[in-house]
């Protein structure tokens, strides 16, 4: 059994963001604090559970949440690559982002335990342990010096726990197959669900109806499983090239009884996607947030050491600049210039240069790759991981090794050239991972691609790209 002393949570609150009404309860986010010892115990269980699920191929393949080697970026990369590939064929595509209300808090314990037993083979003592883990939990809310009475928790996976998110992933695994049965493509990251599909422009209304039927089926499944789809926050985005924008539907999509109007852009797991797939909104938001952080850092520049300032810039600015940049391959030059301006301003701040001073020597001294090479670096690393089986399973099949018999086909004992698929539009099809991965990989020398470990590959790759950016 799970020790009862580890089942009590202490709930505190923090303001969601500055400027919200402090008297409104909706302005606060509850934070669940659990025993540190209980989290250590949960880590051991998670390790055993994940090993069991992996060894028996039971993990949902298109669920990227809480899995090693998976991330929000790889999830969006897969979805956006599929959409770009469809648009490159001349089709139009639609992406629906589903939003759940308090998803982790409404999980039904009986349904979860039944699913663990029937769908994932968790039986006997292990099943009894999970039942003990989920039931008999309590929480106390603390606000300042005040404390509430003890409240029993009758549903939901434990917030703030290590095991809870994994259990939620297993609880919602059927959503993926439900979407696929509806003839559409799904992808999930925890409770963030993406449903998408494509069709010829003349069949857009049929695709819209298929999306509506599928999403309503998902909403019905959620209701029967004690989850609630938030139709007011569900978004629909139609994607096509600029010339086909006029062919996109403008009618609302009926979702759970509420009409959802198509939007011109959506924020998918922190990456903004526009209907024309040019990524203007994402670049604009990234540049705006990075410069806001730089303005704040400029105010404290004289109060910190150069090393501290560099650490802050890397943590608060470059992390934003690099997030999601695997989907920025093939950007129009003017958008790349805007992103590069952030990198240049960061280097000027650290090196105390004036606004119009040359930044080339500063970038070289900091050993920073330019934006274009940073994108190539990310693509190359994901390609290496895919070829060596440490990337998400849904990325590997997008790459194809050149079929050239004999040892002459090998660039080295472990590195083959990759085949880039033919594309119709260079500004669309060449931006998919299936095309960008081989293009970047085949441009690298054998000394880089033949690296035996990921760490060695990263080191050699950066050295190679740095030499290209700043030739001696």
Predicted features and spans:
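Hydrophobic/basic alpha-helical segments
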Residues: 7-12, 17-472
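Short, low-complexity, charged/polar segments at coil/turn and helix-coil boundaries
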Residues: 1-4
């Amino acid at each position: 059994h799970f020790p009862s002393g580890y089942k009590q949570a202490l709930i505190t609150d923090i303001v969601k963001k500055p400027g919200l009404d402090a008297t409104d309860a909706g302005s606060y986010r509850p934070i669940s604090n659990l025993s540190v010892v209980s989290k250590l115990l949960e880590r051991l269980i998670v390790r055993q559970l994940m090993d069991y699920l992996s060894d028996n191929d039971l993990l949902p393949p298109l669920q990227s949440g809480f899995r090693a080697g998976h991330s929000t970026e790889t999830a969006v990369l897969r979805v956006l690559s599929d959409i770009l590939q469809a648009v490159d064929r001349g089709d139009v595509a639609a992406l629906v982002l589903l939003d759940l209300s308090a998803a982790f808090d409404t999980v039904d314990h009986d349904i979860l335990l039944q699913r663990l037993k029937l769908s994932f083979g968790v039986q006997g003592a292990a099943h009894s342990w999970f039942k003990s883990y989920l039931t008999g939990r309590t929480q106390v809310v603390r606000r300042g010096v005040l404390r509430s009475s003890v409240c029993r928790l009758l549903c939901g996976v434990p917030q703030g726990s290590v095991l809870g998110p994994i259990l939620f992933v297993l609880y919602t695994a059927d959503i993926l197959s439900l979407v696929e049965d509806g003839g559409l493509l799904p992808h999930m990251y925890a409770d963030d669900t993406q449903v998408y599909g494509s069709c010829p422009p003349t069949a857009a209304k049929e695709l819209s109806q298929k999306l509506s039927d599928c999403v309503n089926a998902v909403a019905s499944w959620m209701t029967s499983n004690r989850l609630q789809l938030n139709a007011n926050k569900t978004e629909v985005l139609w994607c096509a090239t600029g010339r086909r924008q006029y062919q996109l539907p403008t009618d609302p999509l009926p979702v759970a009884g509420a009409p959802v109007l198509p939007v011109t852009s959506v924020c998918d797991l922190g990456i903004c996607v526009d209907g024309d797939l040019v990524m203007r909104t994402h670049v604009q938001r990234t540049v705006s947030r990075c410069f806001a952080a730089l303005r704040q850092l400029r105010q404290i520049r004289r109060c910190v050491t150069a090393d501290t300032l560099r650490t802050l810039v890397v943590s608060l600015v470059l992390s934003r600049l690099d997030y999601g940049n695997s989907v920025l391959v093939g950007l129009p030059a003017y958008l790349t210039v805007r992103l590069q301006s952030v990198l240049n301003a960061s280097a000027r701040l650290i090196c105390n240069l004036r606004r119009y001073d040359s930044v080339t020597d500063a970038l070289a001294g900091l050993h920073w790759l330019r934006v274009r090479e940073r994108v190539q670096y990310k693509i190359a690393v994901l390609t290496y991981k895919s070829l060596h089986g440490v990337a998400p399973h849904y990325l590997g099949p997008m790459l194809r090794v050149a079929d050239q018999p004999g040892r002459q086909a090998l660039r080295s004992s472990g590195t083959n050239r990759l085949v880039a698929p033919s594309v119709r539009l260079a500004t669309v099809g060449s931006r998919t991972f299936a095309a960008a991965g081989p293009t970047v990989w085949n441009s690298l020398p054998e000394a880089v691609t033949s690296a035996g470990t990921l760490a060695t590959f990263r080191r050699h790759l950066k050295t190679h790209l740095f030499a290209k950016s700043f030739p001696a």
